[in-house]
């Protein structure tokens, strides 16, 4: 199938960030926001080379005059035209490759609608003329990256979180739980609680500022009630943040109230279990004989697991749910923001994987539905 001298491309299209690079590399070459921006004002200066749309970092840097849209929501592509722009940008501007010369590995969230991966497959073969492609489940790749074959992965990105138990390399589909609560919801919640403090953030561009505040200052409290008392009685937890216009805002309990929603989704008006309960429920759906191995190999992955304090809090919460003698280990690799991509890089460069690719020929014979037969 693929010649050995042609490196496969690995593209992890997240709801928030797109990570792209070459199989065999230890980190993605390109990481940029999964954003397409369109001007919201009339261009008046001729010869400025104004475009009708901007992608990624360029959209981010011109955000003040653009309306920003994320074509991927909750891990599902909602706007295929914009998605095509992002892929085009990935291949031609970021990686500078001809997509028709390289096999491409894409990633997706589990329990996604079937039509989503069929359309991905169709665009890769028909628009970009890929010689071969494959769609892998994000959490499975994170486990590859951690060097394990057994464990439960809590993968939480910008659009979707999911827990996937894997035993000896087999994913257990009946025990996968998907939670549509992730980083973007926390950004929205942060916008809301900052409004209560008298700071107003409304536009799509201002949301990006709030996302930055969240990423730089938020953390997970080990004991939420205790932390709330500390915040109320002293200013030790307050931090200041400088907005792009030089104005300085101060945030206090918002720093840990925001990610607390991961453990208490009721904060967002969501009627679902928190990430700790979801992980526990996922383990409980597995056979009693393998639970011990899952408790001892709970792997965190994705950008929304980057909050300081999250691993200790997970350890505490799961310990109180699990049987008292159970050994619980939360693994939080420092590079977990990119572990899905890293796992993809490992997978696509394995010699045993080379017969797994869907080739252009197979696609021409069977159509887009081949993706369900050949990809887990």
UniProtKB/Swiss-Prot annotation:
Coiled coil: none annotated. It is found in: Cytoplasm, Cytoskeleton. Its main location: cytoplasm. Gene3D superfamilies: 3.30.420.40, Actin, Chain A, domain 4. One of its GO terms (molecular function) is hydrolase activity. Belongs to the actin family. This is Actin-1/2.
């Amino acid at each position: 199938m693929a010649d050995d001298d042609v490196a496969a491309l690995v593209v992890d299209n997240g709801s928030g960030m797109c990570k792209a690079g070459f199989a065999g590399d230890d980190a993605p070459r390109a990481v940029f926001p999964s954003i397409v921006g369109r001007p919201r004002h009339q261009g008046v200066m001729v010869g400025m080379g104004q475009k009708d749309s901007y992608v990624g970092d360029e959209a981010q840097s011109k955000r003040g005059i653009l309306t920003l849209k994320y074509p991927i929501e909750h891990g599902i592509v909602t706007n295929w035209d914009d998605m095509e722009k992002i892929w085009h940008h990935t291949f031609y501007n970021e990686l500078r490759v001809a997509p028709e010369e390289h096999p491409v590995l894409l990633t997706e969230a589990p329990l996604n609608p079937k039509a989503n991966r069929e359309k991905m497959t169709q665009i890769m073969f028909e628009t970009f003329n890929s010689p071969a492609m494959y769609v892998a489940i994000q959490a499975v790749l994170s486990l590859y990256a951690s060097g394990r074959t057994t464990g439960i992965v809590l993968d939480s990105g910008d659009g979707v979180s999911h827990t996937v138990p894997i035993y000896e390399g087999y994913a257990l589909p009946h025990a996968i739980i998907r939670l549509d609560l992730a980083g973007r919801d926390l950004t929205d919640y942060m916008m809301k609680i900052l409004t209560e403090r008298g700071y107003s953030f409304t536009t799509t561009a201002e949301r990006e500022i709030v996302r930055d505040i969240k990423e730089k200052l938020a953390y997970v409290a080990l004991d939420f009630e205790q932390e709330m008392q500390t915040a109320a009685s002293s200013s030790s937890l307050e931090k200041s943040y400088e907005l792009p216009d030089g104005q300085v805002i101060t945030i206090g309990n918002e720093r840990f109230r925001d990610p607390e929603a991961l453990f208490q989704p009721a904060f967002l008006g969501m009627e679902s279990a928190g990430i700790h309960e979801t992980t526990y429920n996922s383990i409980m759906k597995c056979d009693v004989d393998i639970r011990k191995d899952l408790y001892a190999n709970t792997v965190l992955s994705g950008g929304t697991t980057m909050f300081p304090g999250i691993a200790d809090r997970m350890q505490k919460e799961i310990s109180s749910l699990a049987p008292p003698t159970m050994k619980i280990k939360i693994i939080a690799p420092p590079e977990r923001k990119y572990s899905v991509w890293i796992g993809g890089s490992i997978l696509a460069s394995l010699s045993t994987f080379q017969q797994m690719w869907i080739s252009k020929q197979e696609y021409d014979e069977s159509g887009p539905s081949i993706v369900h037969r050949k990809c887990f």
